[in-house]
Design a protein with these regions (language model features):
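Conserved acidic
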Residues: 11, 62, 156
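Conserved AdoMet
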Residues: 40-119
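Conserved SAM/SAH cofactor-binding pocket of Class I
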Residues: 108-165
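A general structural signal for well-ordered alpha-helical segments in protein cores
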Residues: 16, 35, 70, 80-83, ...
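A short N-terminal interaction module
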Residues: 2, 6-57, 70
Length: 165
């Protein structure tokens, strides 16, 4: 039984619907999608198991372990903390990068910059400098995907550099 919600028969579907409703009431865009990602992170459930078990009661021990975390994550999202910061990660150029409140969240439009460098500068001996690297997504993507030999990432923020490492 989950002490927080007082129920022992809560299903995955009900849990997701409640999370989506809570975020929707807070005016969060894409509330259902965000509730899914938060539930996935809090409980470690994947889509296959969700669809197979969505109408079955969640095992009490699993509910007890994840419910509080899920509620905390929903509250943060309702307060408009970005989903990526709550989850601590963002995909960029096919890789997953750590993010928190100390760095900007990598965006798809920045991927165009990386793609352009990869396309227009095939020479691997270039010296590349990523100023204000934040999460390090640009520098790391160029080094990994482009095979550039000399990529330097710098930031004035020690907190940002810890994220980039």
């Amino acid at each position: 039984m989950s002490e927080e919600n007082g129920r022992t028969d809560l299903t995955w579907r009900e849990l997701l619907d409640e999370g989506g409703a809570r975020l929707s009431e807070a005016g969060v865009p894409d509330a259902g999608t965000d509730a899914w990602y938060l539930m996935e992170a809090a409980f470690g459930i994947d889509r296959v198991h969700y669809y197979l078990d969505q109408n079955r009661p969640i095992h009490a021990e699993r509910l007890e372990k994840g419910y509080g975390r899920y509620q905390e994550m929903l509250q943060k999202r309702a307060e408009r903390i970005p989903l990526q910061q709550i989850l601590g990660m963002q995909d960029f150029m096919g890789m997953t990068f750590s993010v928190d409140e100390n760095v900007l969240i990598p965006r798809q439009d920045t991927e165009t910059l990386v793609e352009r460098v990869l396309r227009d500068y095939p020479e691997k001996d270039l010296k590349l400098l990523d100023m204000c690297t934040g999460s390090g997504c640009i520098a790391i993507s160029l080094a990994v995907l482009g095979g550039y030999q000399n990529v330097t990432a710098v930031d004035i923020s020690e907190a940002a550099l810890r994220v980039a490492k």
